[in-house]
Structure formats: structure tokens, C-alpha cells
């Protein structure tokens, strides 16, 4: 497995006893108590919404490493609030009080929205993995944390596509795999909605299984979201630009139009 160099990997051991905040530690301790992980190795990525940690897996899981994605506390996080991602999602708020609290932006409403957001990523991971899409294998959700397959090792994570160094042939192979996965996602009625070279991981040592698509909480259901086609086109064009700069030739708009037409006709 080819991994990216992680500056944090060498000096971020024993995080439980250093800079990790108590709520994050509690979330990760839950996975230890469940005999799913034995050690937190290093922080992989910290964003506005969550921090991902590389963990040593418990032998009983059958894995060597796992990734723990811990969503940040409500006071520290900044969730995607774009209306386009929320279209037709008010169906999640069946309780009138909950729906009103969310629409009014109260702390209670935001907390409910937060837990639904975490739950959405778990649900999307589970459904897409079951549909054969190359997403991390989901292991467990516990509160505000999700445990999943880790694409990397003790030395660091596999690189994001944005940082990957691929030959033209490997780039062509990767693009074919990504297109196949975009198609499988739509076949399962999902559009990623934020796909880019920054959330596709690459392991060029295994050309047949070299990609993992990550960051899925904002994915939309193409059957209900009226912006699904536009989001799909943006996903394809944004991702393809990276490949186009590396000599890969394709018609991103043509691929998207044909894919959408076949999905609408139930031909996928």
C-alpha cells in the first residue's frame, strides 16, 4: 500500500493523554470499550465538521487499522447549510417540535440536526457499501463518532487524488473506476454532491481497487432532490478537471447526460 507521509504520525502517539479534548477522548474510548480499537495512532484530517483518526484495530475485527471520524461539538463545528443539500430533507423531521426548532435555529434544533447529519453519513456509507460502491467499509456508529475502514497504515493515510502522483495509464484506470462508482451511486439513487479530488483516496499499488470515495453526509437522494442533476454534473466536471490536466480524454457533460438519461429510464 502506498501512503502519503503524515507529519502527525510520528509525534502524535498516545493522544489520549495529550491534546485530545475530553469529549473526543470519550467518543474514541467507546470504540475501545466495544473491543473495536486498541490505540489511536494519529490524526489524519481535521476539518470544520469532524476530525478523522487512524486507529489500531482490535484483532477481533479482522482489520489491522480503522479510521474513527469524530464530529466536533456543536459549539466548534460548522455544518454545510446550503439550501440545495436540504431540499426535500424536511421529511427527516417528522416531529413538529423538532422541525420548528431546526427551522428557528435553536440550540435544540441544531443538536437534532447534528445527530441526523452524523446518522446520514452512517446510513449513506452502509447503503453505498452494500451497493458495491468503493466507500470505506462501515464498522460502527456510536453517538457522534463513526468507525470505518482505514485506507492507509501506521505510517500515514493513502493520498487524496489531489496529491496523488499517477502515470497517465494509472490516471486513466482511476478515472474509469471513479466513473463506474458514480454510476453505481446513482443506480442506488445517490449523488455525492461534493465530489472532488479532495475526497477521493488513491492507492496506486492496487489498480483494480485503487479508489475510496469519502465524506458522504451531504449526499442527496436523486429521486427527491430537484438539484440532483446539477450536483451530479458538478461532481463529474470537478473531478474530471484533475484528470484532464494529466492527459485523460473524455466528455464529462456527455457522460453525465447519458448516465442521467439511463437512470431516469431505469436502465442502470
Short names for language-model regions:
Residues 17-157, 183, 187:
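Conserved ATP-binding subdomain of kinase catalytic cores across diverse folds
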Residues 135, 196-202:
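Catalytic-loop Lys-Pro-X-Asn motif of eukaryotic-like protein kinases
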Amino acid at each position: 500500500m502506498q501512503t502519503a507521509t503524515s507529519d502527525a504520525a510520528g509525534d502524535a502517539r498516545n493522544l489520549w493523554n495529550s491534546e485530545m479534548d475530553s469529549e473526543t477522548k470519550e467518543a474514541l474510548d467507546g470504540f475501545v470499550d466495544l473491543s473495536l480499537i486498541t490505540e489511536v495512532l494519529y490524526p489524519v484530517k481535521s476539518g470544520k465538521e469532524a476530525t478523522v483518526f487512524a486507529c489500531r484495530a482490535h484483532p477481533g475485527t479482522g482489520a489491522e487499522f480503522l479510521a474513527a471520524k469524530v464530529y466536533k461539538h456543536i459549539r466548534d463545528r460548522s455544518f454545510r447549510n446550503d439550501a440545495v443539500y436540504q431540499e426535500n430533507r424536511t421529511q427527516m423531521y417528522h416531529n413538529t417540535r423538532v422541525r420548528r426548532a431546526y427551522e428557528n435555529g435553536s440550540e435544540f434544533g441544531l443538536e437534532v440536526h447534528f445527530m441526523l447529519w452524523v446518522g446520514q453519513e452512517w446510513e449513506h456509507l452502509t447503503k453505498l457499501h452494500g451497493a458495491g460502491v468503493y466507500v470505506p467499509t462501515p464498522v460502527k456508529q456510536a453517538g457522534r463518532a463513526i468507525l470505518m475502514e482505514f485506507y492507509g497504515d501506521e505510517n500515514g493515510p493513502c493520498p487524496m487524488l489531489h496529491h496523488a502522483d499517477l502515470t497517465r495509464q494509472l490516471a486513466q484506470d482511476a478515472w474509469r473506476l471513479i466513473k463506474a462508482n458514480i454510476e453505481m451511486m446513482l443506480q442506488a439513487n445517490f449523488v455525492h454532491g461534493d465530489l472532488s479530488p479532495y475526497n477521493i483516496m488513491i492507492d496506486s499499488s492496487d489498480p483494480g481497487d485503487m479508489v475510496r470515495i469519502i465524506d458522504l453526509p451531504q449526499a442527496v437522494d436523486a429521486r427527491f432532490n430537484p438539484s440532483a442533476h446539477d450536483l451530479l454534473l458538478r461532481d463529474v466536471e470537478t473531478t474530471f478537471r484533475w484528470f484532464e490536466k494529466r492527459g485523460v480524454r473524455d466528455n464529462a457533460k456527455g457522460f453525465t447526460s447519458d448516465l442521467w438519461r439511463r437512470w431516469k429510464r431505469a436502465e442502470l
